[in-house]
Amino acid sequence: MTDPHTTTLPTQFDPTGIEPKWAARWRSEPFRADATSGKDPFTIVIPPPNVTGNLHLGHALDNTLIDTLIRYKRMAGFEALYLPGMDHAGISTQVVVERQLKDAGTSRHDLGREAFLEKVWEWKGKSGGMILDQLTRLGVSADWTRERFTMDEGLSRAVRTQFVKLYHDGLAYRGERIVNWDPASQTTLSELEIDREVRKGKMYTLSYKLENSAERGSNGETGEIRIATVRPETIFADQAIAVHPEDERFRHLVGQKARIPLTDRWVPIIADEAVEMEFGVGALKITPAHDPTDFEVGERHGLERPSVIDLDGNLTRDELVPAEFQGLERFAARKAVVKALEESGDLLEQKDHDTAIGLSERTKVPVEPIISEQWFVKMKPFADQVLEGLDKGEIKLVPERYTKVNRDWLENIRDWNISRQLWWGHQIPAWYDKEGNIYVPDPENPELDCDQDPRYAHLNLRRDPDVFDTWFSSNLWPFSTLGWPDTDSEDFRKFYPTQVLVTGYDILFFWVARMQMAGYGLTGQAPFSTVMLHGLYLDAKGQKMSKSKGNGIDPLELFGQYGVDACRFAFTFLSTGGQDIKHDARRFEQGRNFANKLWNATRFALMRLGEARIEGSDDLSAYVRAAVTLPDGVLLRSKDVLAQLKERDDLTLADRWIISRLNDVTAEASAQLDAFDIGAAIRTLYSFTWDEFCDWYIEAAKPELASGNLGTMATLKVVLEHVLKLLHPFMPFITSELYAALGHRRQIAVHSWPQPDAALHDAEATKAFDALRSAVDSARSLKSELGLSPQDRLNVAVDGDLADVVRQNARVVEGIARVNLVPALEGRTLSQVAPGVTILAPLEGTVDIADWVKKQQKRLAELDKQIKQAQGKLNNEGFVARAPAEVIEEEKRRVADFGAQKERLEGVLAQLG
């Protein structure tokens, strides 16, 4: 790591030379938040990654955005807490350990529950948590002393307290409902543990014979009603035929009965608005045990709900199922049933049909909707509390459009299945006696197991073997990590409720909404005031990354290729308004180039300040302290330094301009960060640093620095330090290194964020320096049009309202544009007009005018051709319909650019006659 007293930097920037040292320092000397401080809190809890996980681009994006906000708020004077931790990831972890046991020739059932759980904890100790080490490499400024795990003792107590309260409040209950069942892992699954995939399948149209054979069906056929289904193997569990009450085709059949094919069972024809009249043939078979919608229809109509598919995914050995199909695997049964339907004449049609199916994320086995007795939580009371909070503005979603999405889900909330048939997780604290009565610990003593309670000693209770859904613990994350249910703990009182949650929109329902409901339900408050949602990180073609597609990108490889700061730059630069993010290697290259630019600018400053720079100050170097005439011993805020710097009488126009622009950009970037528009903030700072500070100010300052102008030296150092502070939340490694190289013992992360001051805005200097920039741009453009290289010198003259400003600062224009500013020019000239400034260049003596005109006419013809080609694409409806939006925008830009060049050339040629 650079010694704070060094005066030089290596010629080349090498991220690998600085990143490991700073990362190690931030892990060993964490940014500990003080629960007793008088500062306003700013808390963000990490979306806890799975203990089984490795860092992927979603994690890298999440935590870069979080760390950017945390570092900004810490510098802005808040007591900032970035709370890290991991989720126990019930099914994922159990699958990993079971796979290891299988490789060793055993199983969890061979070991038994206690021994298996010991194996899981052993695995967690050795292999779990690798992702947190990878987050350290990302440079997150987390408070590692507060690291949490959802199976920690304190968090386990919170989970237990939650369930006990819900049960005794009548909100947690045991009942039969449709659940997502994984036949391979033998457990229910949450929606987030299911991958949705569209596969080629078949739609089967079946004939259900009507009880009154004289009646006509929907298509005028006599004695039958036609049903379309993608799952003919479930017909044996049918309990009704449903039609829409307003469907004229079927209204006359409501109340009659129809026979299930291949059976002698008759079911009623009912009317229900759940039926989509346009789907299939407009009539729906109702199988309450094997479809969520059918289950709800069955509830409304009091239908029975027998199941014909067992927990292994086979047809049951039940009298409802004809003997020849009993015990068949469900997909084999489908083929057998279709064949039998063909033979019986009840299969009227089968056609190709794209079917959306759910696959278990871990086992890749198709999920089976089945009825199962599970634990559920009534969610509507909690959803109503969140909706009221949204109405009051207690929770803000960024971007705002997600508020409606959030609200729609809450308004249509369903009860939550919280039990899982696993061993790894929080075992449900419920016990049963031999009659099946349920016993749950007393709310006054939730830690006391019922089988240890003296009141129940005579009952020989057995504990529920199931565990809670992983989300049942992670929904407590914003407050269980801060000590809840101990609401008097220092951390809970200081840091709860948290300020911001940063996460992807894809878990808005599974996690974010549930945290909102848990927060209101258990603490009486919203768990966070702002939810900042970002999009999914996609590959360069806009597709989701997955192992099966082979399109995944390892962020650790990106770190090695570009450097972590460059990657953080890219992640933030690409983040725009909650939109999905396409991987763009150019942004990572841009980040690497930007880091190099910053490194070289600091090297230049160190070399130019030279012997005038005196080491030793903790906040500002003694040199700058003297240069801006600050009294010894007084540490001033950034804006005070700039204000006193501005009052010096040896500042140049460029010095005054960059001070004003720095102040304006500080205000702009701060406002963008406060609005959680992190992408806009880094784009603002990038443009200012590269274009204005490095390319314009430093170039303009070179003559003054060479002549020893103390005002310019002070301006260069103070502005550079401000730039490093502004960029620090985004690119912490390089800014920390460079700030230390400028003579600071305290790391930049604990310095104050620059404060804008309206008095520092200098409209006069801005207008004047803009005139210089226009003069330079015009001179460069003229040299290019005349066929000169950037290094060739050219005599130019200036005219216009701001010509005197340009003449007074001739050294700047001449040095940057490599021209000689002369009072006037003889003969024919070529001019470039900008607001307030016209630059003229001589034609005679510079070019062969006739030859030059001929070249411009040829160029004009080329431009006409290019405009027609680009415009032709835009006029092609097929191209516009197929091409990505960015390609279309590029063609529009080409038309505009070529048009502007053409207009310029036509004007020049007309001027020459």
From Swiss-Prot:
Which PROSITE patterns does this entry report, sorted A to Z?
AA_TRNA_LIGASE_I
**Which EC class is the enzyme in?**
ligase
Give the EC number. 6.1.1.9
Q: Which domain of life is it from?
A: Bacteria
Q: Name one GO cellular component term.
A: cytosol
The cross-references to Pfam families, in alphabetical order and at most eight, read: Anticodon_1 (PF08264), tRNA-synt_1 (PF00133), Val_tRNA-synt_C (PF10458)
Keywords, A to Z, come to: Aminoacyl-tRNA synthetase, ATP-binding, Coiled coil, Cytoplasm, Ligase, Nucleotide-binding, Protein biosynthesis
UniProt GO MF annotations: aminoacyl-tRNA deacylase activity; ATP binding; valine-tRNA ligase activity
Q: Which residues bind ATP?
A: 547
The protein's annotated catalytic reaction(s) are: tRNA(Val) + L-valine + ATP = L-valyl-tRNA(Val) + AMP + diphosphate
Q: Where in the cell is it found?
A: Cytoplasm
Extract the InterPro entries matched here. aa-tRNA-synth_I_CS, aa-tRNA-synth_Ia, Anticodon_Ia_Val, M/V/L/I-tRNA-synth_anticd-bd, Rossmann-like_a/b/a_fold, tRNA-bd_arm, tRNAsynth_Ia_anticodon-bd, Val-tRNA_synth_C_sf
Major subcellular location class: cytoplasm
Share the domain note from the entry. ValRS has two distinct active sites: one for aminoacylation and one for editing. The misactivated threonine is translocated from the active site to the editing site.
Q: Can you state the subunit structure given in the record?
A: Monomer.
Family of the protein in this entry = Belongs to the class-I aminoacyl-tRNA synthetase family. ValS type 1 subfamily.
Function, as annotated, reads: Catalyzes the attachment of valine to tRNA(Val). As ValRS can inadvertently accommodate and process structurally similar amino acids such as threonine, to avoid such errors, it has a 'posttransfer' editing activity that hydrolyzes mischarged Thr-tRNA(Val) in a tRNA-dependent manner.
State the name under which the record lists this protein: Valine--tRNA ligase
Task: Show the taxonomic lineage.
Answer: Bacteria, Thermotogati, Deinococcota, Deinococci, Deinococcales
Q: Which gene encodes it?
A: valS
